UniProtKB/Swiss-Prot annotation:
InterPro entries: MLST8, Quinoprotein_ADH-like_sf, WD40/YVTN_repeat-like_dom_sf, WD40_repeat_CS, WD40_rpt. It comes from the Eukaryota. One of its GO terms (cellular component) is lysosomal membrane. Part of the mechanistic target of rapamycin complex 1 (mTORC1) which contains MTOR, MLST8 and RPTOR. Component of the mechanistic target of rapamycin complex 2 (mTORC2), consisting in two heterotretramers composed of MTOR, MLST8, RICTOR and MAPKAP1/SIN1. Belongs to the WD repeat LST8 family. Keywords: Cytoplasm, Lysosome, Membrane, Repeat, WD repeat. The keyword Transferase does not apply. It comes from Danio rerio (Zebrafish). Subunit of both mTORC1 and mTORC2, which regulates cell growth and survival in response to nutrient and hormonal signals. mTORC1 is activated in response to growth factors or amino acids. In response to nutrients, mTORC1 is recruited to the lysosome membrane and promotes protein, lipid and nucleotide synthesis by phosphorylating several substrates, such as ribosomal protein S6 kinase (RPS6KB1 and RPS6KB2) and EIF4EBP1 (4E-BP1). Its main location: membrane. It is found in: Lysosome membrane; Cytoplasm. This is Target of rapamycin complex subunit lst8.
Amino acid sequence: MNVNQGTVGSDPVILATAGYDHTVRFWQAHSGICTRTVQHQDSQVNSLEVTPDRSMIAAAGYQHIRMYDLNSNNPNPVINYDGVSKNITSVGFHEDGRWMYTGGEDCMARIWDLRSRNLQCQRIFQVNAPINCVCLHPNQAELIVGDQSGVIHIWDLKTDHNEQLIPEPDVSVNSVHIDPDASYMAAVNSSGNCYVWNLAGGMGDEVTQLIPKTKIPAHKRYSLRCKFSPDSTLLATCSADQTCKIWRTSNFSLMTELSIKSNNPGETSRGWMWDCAFSGDSQYIVTASSDNLARLWCVETGEIKREYSGHQKAVVCLAFNDSVLG
C-alpha cells in the first residue's frame, strides 16, 4: 500500500469502519476522505468482513447479518441473514466464497451456504457460553471459536469433531487468529494476556495439533483483538488500555506500541482500541477505537499517517483489504 498515492477509477483499497452510531463508512485510505456512508438502522455493527471476490461487505449486528454491495451506491442491504436470537460477534468467509461463518452470544457458531437461495444456516456448533470470536484456519477446514467462559474450541468441519483448550479458566477469550502460514495461533483474553501456540498437522485428514509456545502479558486491561500480519512476521494486540502493540513473531518481543493516550494530564481516557488490520505489505496497520476515530499507522515507526473522522460514536470494527485480485 502506498499511503501517498491514490488510484484513478476504482480504488483497489477497501477500508470500511463501523460501530455504535449505526453506520458503515467507506474511506479513501490514502486521503482520509469518507466516500460513502451506509445507514445500518437496526443495531450497532459488531464485525465487518469483505467477501473474497470483493463484491460485498458483511456487517454483523444484533440478530442479523446484512450484506451491502461494494460496486454500487445502493444504500440498502442486498442480502439479509436473520434468525439469530442475540448479538452476532464475528463473521468471515471461506476463501472461495462458498460459505460464511458467524459466532454469537447465543452460544452458537454457524455455517451459512452462500450459494443457496435459502438464507438459512446449514450447520450449527453449540457451546456452553456466549461466543466472542471465530476464525477460520488457512486450511479452510477448521473453525477456531473463543467463548466467554475462557474455552477455545477447534471445530473440525470435515468430521464434526471438536477439541478444547482452556488457557485461563473463566477468563473470557476475546479474539483468536491464525497466521497465514499456519505456523501460529494467538488468543487474547480479558485479563490482558496473549497466548501463542505452534501449529502442527492440519493438512489432509490430520487434525491441527496445538503446542503451547508462549504467554505474553500484553496489556494490563482487557485485550480485545489479535491479528497476525500477512507476512506472518508480526502480531498486533488491541486493548482497553488505549494501545495497540505490535510484537515480532520471531521471538514475540515488543516492536512498536501505538497509543491514543493523551499527553494532557487533564484529559480523560480516549477510549478502547477495539480492532485492527494490517495492510497487504505488512507495513501499515489501521486501528478502530472508541474515540470515534480510525487511524492508519506506520508499523515500524508508530507514526500516525491518517485519521478517519466522521463517526459519531465508538468505532469497534473495521475491514481493510488492499489486495488486488488477479
